[in-house]
Amino acid sequence: MSSIFVHLDDNFYIGTPKGETPVDSITGKFVNSVREYLEQNGMTVTAFARRIGCLERCVARWLNGTNIPSTEYVIKTADALHWSVDYLFERTDRAAFMPAAAPSSFSERLHALLSSCKENKRTLARIWQVEPSALTKWLNGSRMPKPDTVYKLADFFNCSMDYLLGRTDIP
């Protein structure tokens, strides 16, 4: 996949040709949403990076497919744009979401969802194709899963990514 330069307002941003999905299809949905936002708002990567509180080179690398955003940066993006994470990942057509009255952490939500699950942690780790130690780190709050894993967990629990991430109280 070759990178191209698109000229916007005397600045450049790095991107892939429209229609190509960088990295993988789940992360590609997020990247496509960011790319569309930049195009529709005539915004540069520099301005966008400032808006979400991220380094310009990080955003450029998301757009050219050399890096994937962390879940923390996905949340920062959603917060800065006042959009749902599910909208950024093309899981819903609605950008708006109802913020949680008292936001929860990912680990709190995961604990709550696991309490009604019949499977043990080792089985779930195998189903989710992660190491059991990763699940332990998610549960104790020392690590967040990658965005594509959050997407898959939301599918597994039949809830929104925003609910799983503690951004809304609506599953």
What is each residue range found by the language model?
Residues 3-43, 94-119:
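A short, Lys/Arg-rich alpha-helix, primarily the initiator
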Residues 38, 49, 78, 114, ...:
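The alpha-helix within a helix-turn-helix
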